[in-house]
Amino acid sequence: LNFILEENSSLKIVDIYEHKSEKNFINTFYNFILKENAILKNFKIDKSQNSNIKYSYNNIDQSKDSISETFILSNGSKFLKNEINCNLKGQYSSAFINGVFSLDSDKHHEIRTSINHLVENTKSFQLIKSVLDDKSKSVYQGKIYVSPDAQKTDGYQLSKCILLDKNTEFNAKPELEIYADDVKCSHGSASGSLNE
């Protein structure tokens, strides 16, 4: 699906997946074009309690002063992968991505993000939190790219995970690719089990 958000417009999309059938493959693609001062809010909630396989891809192109916010709640399907590619093409554009994994029963969920800071004075914020139990696995791969023209970039990325079972697995791959020298970018990841 293609969405064009004109100047000073806003759009809120709430995707709730609660499929009752035993086995499905679901593939979604959204292409968002945000013009000046546009605001996008996208909520992705997966509550399917079955053997579904789901893949979701968002491409977001942002103009000056636009804001995109993506929230992912991931606790349903057997296998789920969310990918977000965001291109900050206008000054003072901002992208915010928040994700929560709450997994059990041998589920495998992934979030992969790529935030591309292409001009000056752009901002991104990514925060992913996970609670894993019963042989489940989650993956977070987040990339912040800063082009040579993207001075004054502010990029932040953090992932945290609590492992409730010794057979769970959390893999984090934070990436920074920076070609400008006047930027503020950081990334971090922490995971561990609770004390007995």
What residue spans do the PLM features occupy?
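Conserved beta-strand/loop scaffold segments within soluble protein domains that form the structured core
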Residues: 1-196
